[in-house]
């Protein structure tokens, strides 16, 4: 069962992330209401559905595809971000790793992988994360998991 995230901590964190991206001239997009299979671009076996206006739709897992669409249709934007709720139907959720419903803050921007990594480092600095020996841990995704 989900428990409520501390509202003060949630608000503080989300507002700080919003400030970071707004200062970079990113535009916030609302993706939660978009009804499309694009909202379920993670693992198709973990999709939950709902019925709306006589059709079955996937509950959104991510706003990623919509954010990419916003950038493609607005090339003058530096980037875009959204805050949404992700719904997952993990068959074997691992406690502490797989929540079935959770808030998600996502962003998309122009650039390459180095640009993305640099932005993530800037965001971690902005949020006040501590570095170890002057940097953040790095590694191959599969090794870290």
Regions found by a protein language model. Give the residues of each.
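Metal-assisted phosphate- and nucleotidyl-transfer catalytic regions
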Residues: 117-145
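Class II aminoacyl-tRNA synthetase-like tRNA-binding/catalytic domains
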Residues: 1-110
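Alpha-helical packing segments of well-folded alpha/beta enzyme cores
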Residues: 13-17, 116, 123
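Extended, domain-scale alpha-helical bundle/helix-rich regions
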Residues: 111-115
């Amino acid at each position: 069962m989900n428990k409520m995230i501390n509202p003060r901590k949630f608000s503080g964190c989300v507002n700080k992330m919003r400030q970071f991206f707004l200062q970079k001239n990113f535009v916030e997009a609302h993706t939660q209401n978009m009804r499309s299979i694009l909202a379920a671009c993670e693992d198709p076996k973990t999709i939950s559905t709902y019925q709306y206006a006589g059709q079955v739709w996937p509950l959104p897992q991510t706003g990623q595809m919509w954010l990419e669409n916003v950038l493609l249709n607005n090339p003058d934007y530096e980037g875009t971000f959204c805050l949404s709720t992700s719904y997952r139907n993990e068959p074997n959720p691992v406690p502490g790793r797989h929540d079935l419903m959770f808030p998600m803050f996502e962003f998309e921007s122009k650039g390459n992988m180095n640009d993305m990594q640099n932005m993530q480092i800037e965001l971690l600095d902005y949020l006040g994360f501590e570095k170890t020996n002057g940097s953040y841990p790095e590694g191959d995704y599969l090794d870290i998991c």
